[in-house]
């Protein structure tokens, strides 16, 4: 049986980049300058909780932040070491996800509150962590590493 290999739908639209600072995240970078933060190293144990709170700013929940308008008024400014979320696995392990780039936090995936295992089972679509932009006219930022190989789909004929 011979099969054909095709790039996934996500990899046809976005370029997959590594983080220079953190090996547990990857970026799906769109040519428009929008970047989706996804998990790169998928834990084997089921994810049971995702916490978007932070110890700074009195534990504010990042997922409830409201962003509006063309200028993204109300968006949080991220530094490379800004914590996006912490997720806990069934085996008791806890993982911190940081931004890794300087940018503007447009959206957190609040779907992970009700279905936290999406971060493990569907990291490139329903389980994305955050959406980041970089300001007017900026398409890419420092902190993104090398291109990662695209995910391939194999169809049997």
Swiss-Prot record:
InterPro entries to which the protein is assigned, alphabetical: Abitram, Single_hybrid_motif
GO cellular component assignments: dendrite; filopodium tip; lamellipodium; nucleus
Gene Ontology biological process terms from the UniProt entry: dendrite morphogenesis; regulation of actin filament polymerization; regulation of filopodium assembly
Transmembrane segments: none
Disulfide partners: none
Highest taxon above the source species: Eukaryota
Sample GO molecular function, one term: actin monomer binding
Protein's recorded name: Uncharacterized protein F54F2.7
Gene source species: Caenorhabditis elegans
Taxonomic placement: Eukaryota, Metazoa, Ecdysozoa, Nematoda, Chromadorea
